[in-house]
């Protein structure tokens, strides 16, 4: 397939500009200072090696970018509706040596969504196996199981013919990966690039998942709320899972350049690494990840050689609507905060947690509401799998009234619960304290040598 001279020139210019951006990000301060490298997931010398070796093939592979403008997809089932939805959910699927999880994944997506949510959502499955017989069999199976959703335009199955793929033979073996792994991950990058291109005009936002995940109930509404909370910010990626590229959300307007990015560097590194670099190139330095996670990995066997893969997200919550209200508040503690693990990270739905040094008898963590609230339920989780000893060994939860003049505390507190093995959850608190409260406080009742991690604090209020 050939491109016009004008299109080829545009592709070369775009590739050169992208390469320049990568070099600037890698060494924005000094060519001699490797600490300035922003690609934290990749050693700087490895990236430089890739760029030096790849500078030639970048110009050669611009023909691959032209393919994105001329793809003739095979519609295996369903057809996109003419009007845009709020959300497109995209996943790519190939034959696994062991296990077949696609039907369960689709069932979870549809079952965990209300009728109103489904009206604003479309699911696109890219059946990307090289075996056309397998693709046809899966398409027939899915069409039979989900005929209702296909007829309503909620589910579309596509395939990209082999002739549109770049070469998958003789690829560079970066990181000493075996040849078969390099071929697998390189094809996976191209699979996603073609999927992104197809989905770019279907919706306002695009959610990336895998073909072996469970979805939380009402994940759609949780995502809509998360997007609204980021209004006015120039985010590139929002994340709703800790695992790989499960639960990554993009603006659909960014999908064409993300597709070009994956296709340009398809043989260099795995997809999740490229997605991280894409986020950095779009100047989003920090990960924006929401808690709890909305998607859980369920597949036991990976799509690469059928190896056992027991990955699980320990922050997954099955009901996305069972989310705390967490009224606007100021947070205070008399514990010494370690580095940037601020109190706000325990109270926010975003990524991170509070980490305090040397909790002693009388150490406190206070939440002072901007406005009084009727608290009905409180849930606090401390400790972490990485630091299992850094949980609250002994402590109580208190509700307070009579906010002091300095706005940092309340004058009167009532103890409502005791921590058990670092965790606490109490419901029906409005029965004991029917009037609005102004403070919620965690108080340490026994000194401990381990530091204290507060993973999350959830507060539910009446009337919300």
Curated annotation (Swiss-Prot):
- The protein's gene is named MGAT4C
Q: Which UniProt keywords apply?
A: Glycoprotein, Glycosyltransferase, Golgi apparatus, Membrane, Metal-binding, Signal-anchor, Transferase, Transmembrane, Transmembrane helix
In its UniProt entry, the species of origin is given as: Gallus gallus
Return the protein name: Alpha-1,6-mannosyl-glycoprotein 4-beta-N-acetylglucosaminyltransferase
Enumerate the Lumenal topological stretches: 32-464
Q: Which GO terms describe its cellular component?
A: Golgi membrane
Q: Which residues lie on this side of the membrane: Cytoplasmic?
A: 1-10
Subcellular location as annotated: Golgi apparatus membrane
So what does this one do? Glycosyltransferase that catalyzes the transfer of GlcNAc to the Manalpha1-6 arm to form GlcNAcBeta1-4Manalpha1-6 linkage (also named 'GnT-VI' activity). May also participate in the transfer of N-acetylglucosamine (GlcNAc) to the core mannose residues of N-linked glycans by catalyzing the formation of the GlcNAcbeta1-4 branch on the GlcNAcbeta1-2Manalpha1-3 arm of the core structure of N-linked glycans.
Kindly give the Pfam families that the UniProt entry links to this protein: MGAT4_cons (PF04666), MGAT4A_C (PF23524)
Q: Which family does it belong to?
A: Belongs to the glycosyltransferase 54 family.
Task: Please give the cofactor(s) recorded in the UniProt entry for this protein.
Answer: a divalent metal cation
């Amino acid at each position: 397939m050939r491109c016009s001279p004008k299109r080829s020139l545009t592709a070369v210019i775009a590739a050169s500009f992208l390469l320049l951006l990568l070099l600037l990000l890698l060494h924005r301060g000094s060519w001699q200072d490797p600490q300035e490298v922003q690609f934290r997931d990749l050693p700087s010398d490895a990236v430089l090696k890739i760029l030096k070796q790849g500078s030639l093939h970048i110009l050669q592979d611009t023909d691959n970018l032209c393919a994105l403008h001329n793809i003739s997809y095979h519609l295996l089932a369903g057809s996109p509706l003419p009007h845009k939805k709020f959300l497109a959910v995209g996943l790519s699927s190939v034959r696994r040596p062991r296990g077949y999880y696609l039907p369960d994944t689709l069932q979870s997506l549809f079952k965990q969504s209300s009728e109103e949510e489904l009206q604003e959502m479309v699911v696109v499955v890219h059946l990307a196996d090289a075996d056309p017989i397998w693709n046809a069999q899966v398409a027939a199976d899915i069409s039979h199981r989900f005929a209702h959703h296909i007829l309503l335009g909620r589910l579309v199955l596509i395939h990209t013919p082999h002739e549109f793929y770049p070469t998958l033979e003789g690829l560079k073996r970066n990181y000493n990966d075996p040849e078969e792994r390099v071929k697998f991950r390189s094809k996976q990058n191209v699979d996603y690039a073609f999927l992104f291109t197809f989905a770019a005009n279907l919706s306002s936002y695009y959610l990336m998942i895998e073909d072996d995940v469970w979805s939380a109930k009402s994940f759609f509404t949780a995502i809509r709320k998360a997007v609204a909370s980021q209004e006015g910010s120039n985010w590139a990626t929002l994340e709703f899972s800790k695992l790989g590229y499960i639960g990554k959300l993009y603006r659909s307007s960014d999908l064409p350049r993300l597709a070009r990015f994956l296709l340009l560097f398809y043989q260099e590194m795995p997809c999740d690494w490229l997605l991280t670099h894409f986020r950095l190139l779009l100047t989003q330095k920090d990960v924006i990840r929401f808690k709890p996670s909305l998607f859980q990995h369920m597949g036991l066997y990976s799509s690469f050689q059928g190896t056992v893969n027991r990955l699980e997200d320990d922050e997954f919550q099955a009901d996305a609507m069972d989310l705390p209200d967490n009224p606007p508040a100021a947070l205070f503690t008399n514990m010494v905060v370690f580095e940037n693990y601020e109190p706000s990270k325990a109270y926010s739905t975003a990524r991170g947690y509070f980490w305090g040094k040397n909790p002693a008898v009388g150490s406190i963590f206070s939440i002072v509401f901007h406005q009084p609230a009727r608290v009905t339920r409180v849930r606090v989780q401390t400790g972490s799998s990485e630091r299992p000893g850094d949980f609250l060994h002994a402590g109580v939860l208190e509700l307070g009234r009579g906010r002091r003049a300095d706005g940092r505390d309340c004058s009167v507190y009532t103890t409502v619960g005791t921590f058990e093995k670092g965790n606490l959850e109490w419901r029906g608190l409005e029965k004991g304290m029917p009037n609005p409260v102004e403070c919620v406080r965690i108080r340490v009742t026994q000194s401990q040598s381990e530091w204290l991690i507060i993973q999350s604090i959830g507060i539910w209020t009446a009337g919300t």
